[in-house]
Amino acid sequence: MSRDAVDTSVVVAALLGWHEDHARARAALEGGLAAGGLLVPAPVLVEAYSVMTRLPAPHRISPGDAVALLGDTFRDVTLIALEPREIWALLAWLDERKLAGGRAYDGHILACAKKGRAGRLLTLNAKDFLSFDEGDVEIVRPCE
């Protein structure tokens, strides 16, 4: 069975009802959760927490609410994190490709998806992952 991984853009949109992509992100997330095969790269949870607690008013939520929302949604899913040696390999891979700045976070998320053997990475920002494409994880924007 091929499993889906999600990135931060899908998690934030799925959890915040006011988001313009809420319906499609929520449907994709619920589909993965219902199938029992959803993979969540660990850095996605930290980044989602960061985004949700720094949004401009009135959309910002408190740290406690962010933790509760993430916990209620993802406590029982498979979290994928890199080991120290895998982090060093990721940094070398980024350096070889001259990828810098925020691209490192996208690379970290994709590396976690690969480690979990995800067939697809669901994202609302597909273009952010295109330069990483090595054909082993399909980059997919959730359907309308």
Segments (PLM) and residue ranges:
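Short, well-structured N-terminal submotif of metal-dependent ribonuclease cores
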Residues: M1-V40, L55-A68, C143
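Acidic, PIN/NYN-like endoribonuclease modules and their adjacent C-terminal/linker elements
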Residues: S2-R3, G107-E144
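Short beta-strand scaffold positions
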Residues: V6, L39-V40, A81, A104, ...
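Alpha-helix/helix-capping structural signal
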Residues: S9-V10, P43, H108, K127
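Residues that scaffold the ATP/ADP-binding catalytic core of kinase and kinase-like folds
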Residues: A13-L15, V51, F132
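Acidic catalytic patch
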Residues: G17, A42-V46, F74-R97
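Short active-site oxyanion
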Residues: A34-L38, D76-T78, K115-R120
